[in-house]
């Protein structure tokens, strides 16, 4: 990350005016600005003979970027002239931590305005090295089509160059990758009970530590536990809390799909308000799950761990970077990763990554990290999207658009907004209202949910709020 210049730039001053108060030193806005100065990041801007930049700030590169790491803003107040003499002014922000060096931005620019720097080529070599590593979870496993868990595992384990031991709690990931006598794991793997993945790994780590002290082992081994939300938020919370409090050298990764998916879609304490599950059915007496989900990430922060982070598989650079940091720390660390489940969420098999991205852009699942008690936001949506855009893509929330249930979607939106504002304060970030003011050219439109009602109609019953769906009927969803 480039250092911030000592002298405030025009962009600094303008951003401060837009926000209405000084910018906090470690805020997302300051880090955002660091890439706006030509020559200090991955790209420079090509200059014309007149001395002006070739870039017209048209936004084509921003639209083409598959990982949304580019932000283009045209400053009309400083754009002047006509025809060939026209000079464009604005800012281009490129998040070098998120960039995957796909070259789409340069290929789509018809003015060849973006010129890669040596830093870009260095970053590209680093990305290609990670991409060329052999996946540690082999193909041929039994995970459902579109499951997010396998993606999470391979992204986390891609950051390990040494030997490792994985402890896997009973759940979707375990039963689908370790069907006796076969295994999809290329490293050492221990299948534990539902509730004791962290406890088992604690014993393994302690045994290795004893062997190190006796001089019987020299090579350092990494210890990683994987558990779903059922085995982490609920059944395995006691073992997890104990392992974290005792300070074992291990990384615990929770792949959160929002319910007990392996055993038939029962609700867990990670299930969102209003979601359909087989134990929180939709009907006249109960419109889905009652109550909001537990904030496990904050519970882990309360354990005063050296590193806690929340991530998502749609942003591999973010997840892999956090896994790398967590594995390098001497002590217990925790990652909470969203893991879309097409079967349980009643979504399309090819929509997992898009749903993960929407969860982040609606701020239902923000990306942040806490290092030794210091909060830091690692991604902030350019324009925060309405939660309904995420809800309507999932059949488990389809009933929220029916008469009498609209208030649940509103309650969930209010809850997400409050949690997001609280996180912004913890991260010393600019409030959402002032962030929107800085993006004044974006006009938020009222959002109305349009779920995939044809799936409900296919059940052969009228669309009413009093409908109750059995597990069998929803299996046909």
Explain the meaning of each model-derived region.
Residues 126-252, 265-275, 289, 302:
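Cofactor-binding active-site loop characterized by glycine-rich and histidine/acidic residues
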Residues 57, 61, 66, 105, ...:
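General structural feature for long, well-ordered alpha-helical segments within catalytic domains
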Residues 2-4, 319-477:
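Glycine/aspartate-rich loop-and-adjacent alpha/beta segment that forms the canonical ThDP
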Residues 219-223, 234-251, 255-390:
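Glycine-rich ThDP/TPP pyrophosphate-binding loop and its adjacent helix/strand module
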Residues 1-88, 98, 112-115, 120-145, ...:
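Ferredoxin-type iron-sulfur electron-transfer modules and their immediate structural context
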Residues 88-113, 142, 174-175, 364-379:
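Short Fe-S-cluster ligation motifs
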Residues 73-75, 117, 167-169, 253, ...:
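Generic beta-strand/beta-sheet core signal
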């Amino acid at each position: 990350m480039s250092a911030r210049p000592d002298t405030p730039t025009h962009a600094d001053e303008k951003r401060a005016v837009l926000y209405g108060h000084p910018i906090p030193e470690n805020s997302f806005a300051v880090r955002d600005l660091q890439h706006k100065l030509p020559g200090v990041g991955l790209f420079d801007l090509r200059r014309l003979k007149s001395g002006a930049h070739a870039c017209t700030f048209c936004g084509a590169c921003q639209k083409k970027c598959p990982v949304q790491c580019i932000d283009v803003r045209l400053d009309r107040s400083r754009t002047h002239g006509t025809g060939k003499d026209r000079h464009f002014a604005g800012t281009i922000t490129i998040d070098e931590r998120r960039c995957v060096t796909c070259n789409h931005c340069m290929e789509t620019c018809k003015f060849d305005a973006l010129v890669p720097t040596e830093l870009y080529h260095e970053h590209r070599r680093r990305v290609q090295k990670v991409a060329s590593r052999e996946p540690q979870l082999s193909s041929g496993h039994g995970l459902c089509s579109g499951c997010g868990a396998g993606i999470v595992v391979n992204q986390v384990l891609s950051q390990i160059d040494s030997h490792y031991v994985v402890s896997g709690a009973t759940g979707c990931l375990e039963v689908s990758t370790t069907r006796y006598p076969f295994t999809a794991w290329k490293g050492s793997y221990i299948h534990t009970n539902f509730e004791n993945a962290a406890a088992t790994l604690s014993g393994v780590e302690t045994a290795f530590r004893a062997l190190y002290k006796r001089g019987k082992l020299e090579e350092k081994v990494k210890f990683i536990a994987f558990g779903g939300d059922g085995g982490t938020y609920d059944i395995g919370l006691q073992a997890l809390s104990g392992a974290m409090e005792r300070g074992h050298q291990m990384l615990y990764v929770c792949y959160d799909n929002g319910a007990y998916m392996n055993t038939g879609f029962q609700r867990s304490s990670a299930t969102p308000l209003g979601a359909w599950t087989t134990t929180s059915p939709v009907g006249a007496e109960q419109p889905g799950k009652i109550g909001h989900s537990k904030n496990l990430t904050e519970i882990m922060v309360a354990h005063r761990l050296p590193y806690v982070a929340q991530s998502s598989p749609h942003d591999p650079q973010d997840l892999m970077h956090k896994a790398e940091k967590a594995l390098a720390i001497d002590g217990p660390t925790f990652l909470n990763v969203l893991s879309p489940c097409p079967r349980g969420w009643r979504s399309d098999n090819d929509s997992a990554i898009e749903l993960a991205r929407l969860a982040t852009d609606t701020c239902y699942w923000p990306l942040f990290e806490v290092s030794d008690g210091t909060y830091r936001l690692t991604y902030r949506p350019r324009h925060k999207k309405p939660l309904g855009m995420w809800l309507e893509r999932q059949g488990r929330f389809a009933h929220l658009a029916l008469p009498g249930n609209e208030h649940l979607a509103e309650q969930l939106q209010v809850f997400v907004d409050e949690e997001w504002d609280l996180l912004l304060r913890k991260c010393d970030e600019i409030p959402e209202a002032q962030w929107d003011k800085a993006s004044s050219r974006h006009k938020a439109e009222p959002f109305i949910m349009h779920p995939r009602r044809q799936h409900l109609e296919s059940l052969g019953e009228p669309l009413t709020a009093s409908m109750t769906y059995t597990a069998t009927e929803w299996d046909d969803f």
